[in-house]
Amino acid sequence: MMQGMTRSLASLGRIFGPLAIAVSLLAGAAGAGACAAGKAKIPAGTAQPDNFLYERGTEALNKKKWMTAREYFQTIVETYPQSTHRADAKLGVGDSLLGEGTAASQIQAIQEFREFLSFFPTHARADYAQYKLAMAHYYQMAKPERDQTETREAIREFDIFFERYPNSKLRPEAEKFDRETRDRLSESEYRVGLFYHRARWYPGAIDRFQQVLKNDPKFTNRDAVYFYLSEALVKMNRPAEAVPQLTKLVEEFEVSEFLDDAHKLLTEIKNAPVQPASTPKADGEKEKQKPEAEKPKPAKQDPAVTVKPKTNP
């Protein structure tokens, strides 16, 4: 069959050119999509067709036959509104879309899980739907140097999960992925701060690093934030503020590539000469407290020179 299709496409290309091949391929894809969107067939005489469909859909889902599974589940949702499997079938549709792993299917999965939570808010598997909704955004997260919109959406959905379902059995798994999600966002902010640090724009670096620690105090790679924040503070002549950051690095991390440098920087700060603190004073008070030798003195007159008063001619 494939050989025949190849020969046909080759013939089209010779006669009508590349455009004919493109049109033929698009038509074939559309036809395949239409077949996939059709309803699943039920053997004649099946006593409980919804049970049959759900079992076949679950079997296909476990075998990662995403489109086949979706056909079975979608048929239940659309044809058997009173079925006890309808809610689970709705989740099955979402799972099959997530399984495909394309950007388009993940967007569709988000819609399916949102609809489930809207139609079945008190269902026993509502926590599962909320968890999968967060994961649908998680799978779309960009690299740290790219836009983090999906990362923020994932964090928001995980927060809703923890708030609504604090005792869910899915909580440990959700916490693991939530940590990865927050690390992605914090890593993105940290890299901006590191860019400023390397460009020697220390005020901007300090602001970014402090923001990371404020928003995500459990950031996995915060040892790097502690160290570069401390360096920037020292560069800005604020060593006293660097000491607590370096101390946290040493106390919180038994293993870190920054430990040796942190100890060195701490030692340098502690051994640096102490600058006396000066307090602003009024000009008159400053003048009063100056030693006598430092005060401005009138110019001395040479005794050999006599200054005569001017007289009018």
Task: Go through each PLM region and give its residues.
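Sec-dependent bacterial lipoprotein signal peptides
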Residues: 1-35
